[in-house]
């Protein structure tokens, strides 16, 4: 529970001590032992049982605690050298700062400062959705057999995407984007 509660309790002999533990948990792993599963340019040499054994090293409950789970494919030479019009770091920084301000304003009367700190019971009040967004979320919940924790984290990511777009209501577009960043099937597919 330290990841959800933001505190660690250490119990010794006659006393218990609580310490703050608000962290950002980040992890990375190869898709298989050889690293080439799903690669378009290299052939994976792993057997299905090797891949399954490898991916089962991370438990479902641990994976559930990652808000964003994405596969990052190899970048081709053409993609690497292509000239693209993209947001500058300064533009992205401005959007992030504006989103943080929205969250601070939203939670000014609460004991929280960000969407990541929302509890399940707060989602209805602070994460209003369009009917289309709710329908997409319900469909995804059943199709992906999501846990309650996965559901909560998906909604919070969608709320943050809305904040980055400067919107108060979660749309189907934001749910869809959050679903793309919550690839619960990474380990299941292997």
Model-assigned labels for residue ranges:
Residues 2-189:
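Basic, amphipathic alpha-helical bundle interface domains used for macromolecular binding and assembly
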């Amino acid at each position: 529970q330290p990841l959800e509660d933001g505190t660690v309790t250490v119990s010794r002999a006659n006393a218990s001590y609580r310490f703050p533990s608000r962290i950002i948990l980040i992890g990375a792993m190869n898709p298989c032992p050889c690293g080439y599963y799903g690669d378009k340019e290299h052939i994976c040499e792993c057997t299905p049982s090797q891949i399954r054994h490898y991916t089962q090293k991370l438990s479902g409950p641990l994976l559930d605690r990652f808000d964003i789970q994405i596969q990052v494919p190899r970048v081709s030479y053409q993609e690497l050298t292509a000239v693209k019009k993209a947001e500058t770091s300064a533009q992205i920084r401005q959007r992030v700062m504006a989103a943080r301000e929205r969250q601070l304003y939203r939670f000014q009367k609460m004991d929280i400062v960000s969407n990541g700190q929302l509890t399940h019971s707060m989602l209805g009040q602070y994460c209003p959705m369009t009917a289309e967004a709710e329908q997409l979320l319900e469909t995804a919940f059943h199709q992906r057999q999501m846990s309650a924790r996965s559901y909560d984290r998906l909604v919070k990511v969608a709320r943050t995407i809305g904040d980055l777009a400067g919107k108060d209501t979660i749309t189907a577009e934001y749910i869809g984007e959050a679903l793309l960043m919550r690839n619960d099937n990474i380990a299941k597919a292997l």
